[in-house]
Amino acid sequence: MMSTLVVLLTICLLMLPLTARQLDADQLADQLAERMEDISADQNRWFDPVKRCCMRPICMCPCCVNG
């Protein structure tokens, strides 16, 4: 009975850090996405205001692909 409790406790303690680490990674990705949404076209160094499109060499924007 005692060994069963020790095994169960060990499994729970091993699982806790793994799930907590995964949540931390998700939170960092969410924060990065929120920061990227805050950048306007005026602050983006790749954005060309005349063409109203980006100037990246490899761009999949609709204005770059069509024109």
Swiss-Prot record:
Expressed by the venom duct. Keywords: Cleavage on pair of basic residues, Disulfide bond, Neurotoxin, Secreted, Signal, Toxin. The keyword Disulfide bond applies. It comes from the Eukaryota. Residues 21-52 form a propeptide. Disulfide bonds join 53-63, 54-61, 59-64. Its main location: secreted. It holds the Pfam family Conotoxin. It is found in: Secreted. Belongs to the conotoxin M superfamily. The cysteine framework is III (CC-C-C-CC). Classified in the M-1 branch, since 1 residue stands between the fourth and the fifth cysteine residues. This is Conotoxin Im3.1. It comes from Conus imperialis.
